[in-house]
């Protein structure tokens, strides 16, 4: 949904309680061996992601954030993952966690903090959900998105593209226009950030093309009229930089060859 769940945990909770943060994308996990490793008797075997996290964090009480719990597949392999996660979150068992690479060695995970995120609660295993304290997060209001844009997203993007704060100025109406017309009415700010990144990236490319020392200009697929730094972004420039031009060589939709 893009309403800042990961950021809240990584930049908020982890820093507030001064614990290392580790991220695991459950949508990309193929089976339980990803977490608890393979037996050392197999060629090329390795310990699992949980042990990796403990090694990297150099402590036994990190925050382990499992993202997109509702994306775990409903296949047999997915059930294996759910069973392992159920074991990890059981206070009576998680002090005796074992990685297949280290048979017989008990790993105490009882001090670790496990946090899960999901968008569709109906797709979360009932037994696993029963072990959780569920906190519902809401989407942002337009004024919240503008504040997040000005205070966090724009400073981060300006720093990424090595612009000064005064180099690119977004009018408030321009940001409101992006939110209303280019973000598909999302509850979070993921598409808003993507749009702002596209705009600033194009400005950066255009600026580099104009300052190119070679006589031959770099050909671009877009134009920025009256370009100069500092540059003010209004609604007209938003439309120009975010417009999707049709590819004349692209075959019509639903046409098969």
Where are the model-predicted features located?
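Walker A/P-loop
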Residues: 1-26, 55-56, 86
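AAA+/P-loop NTPase substrate/partner-engagement loops
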Residues: 15-46, 53, 73, 144
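AAA+/SF3 P-loop NTPase mechanochemical coupling elements
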Residues: 57-61, 97-117, 166-170, 226-233
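Conserved C-terminal "switch" segment of AAA+ ATPases
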Residues: 58, 120-130, 134-194, 205-224
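A short beta-strand-to-loop transition that corresponds to the Sensor-1 phosphate-sensing loop
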Residues: 67-69, 90, 111-121
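Conserved catalytic/switch belt of AAA+ P-loop NTPases
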Residues: 68-107
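Short regulatory helix/loop adjacent to the ATP-binding pocket of P-loop NTPases
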Residues: 77-78, 101-102, 107, 119-132
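C-terminal engagement/docking regions of AAA+ P-loop ATPases
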Residues: 190, 195-257
């Amino acid at each position: 949904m893009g309403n800042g769940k990961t950021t809240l945990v990584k930049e908020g909770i982890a820093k507030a309680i001064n614990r290392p943060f580790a991220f695991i994308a459950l949508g990309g996990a193929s089976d339980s061996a990803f977490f608890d490793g393979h037996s050392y008797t197999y060629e090329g075997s390795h310990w699992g992601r949980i042990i990796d996290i403990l090694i990297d964090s150099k402590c036994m009480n990190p925050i382990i954030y499992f993202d997109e719990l509702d994306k775990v597949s409903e296949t047999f392999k997915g059930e294996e993952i759910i069973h392992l996660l159920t074991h990890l979150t059981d206070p009576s068992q998680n002090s005796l966690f074992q990685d297949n690479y280290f048979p017989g060695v008990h790993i105490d995970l009882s001090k670790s903090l496990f946090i899960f995120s999901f968008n569709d609660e109906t797709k979360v295993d009932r037994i696993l959900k029963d072990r959780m304290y569920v906190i519902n997060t809401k989407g942002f209001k337009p004024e919240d998105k503008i504040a997040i844009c000005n205070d966090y997203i724009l400073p981060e993007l300006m720093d990424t593209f090595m612009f000064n704060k005064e180099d690119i100025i977004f009018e408030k109406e321009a940001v409101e226009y992006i939110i209303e017309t280019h973000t598909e009415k999302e509850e979070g700010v993921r598409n808003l950030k993507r749009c702002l990144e596209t705009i600033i990236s194009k400005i950066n490319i255009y600026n580099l093309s104009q300052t190119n020392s070679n006589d031959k200009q770099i050909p671009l697929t877009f134009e920025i009229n009256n370009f100069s730094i500092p540059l003010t972004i209004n609604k007209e420039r938003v439309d120009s930089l975010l417009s999707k031009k049709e590819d004349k060589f692209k075959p019509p939709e639903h046409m098969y060859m």
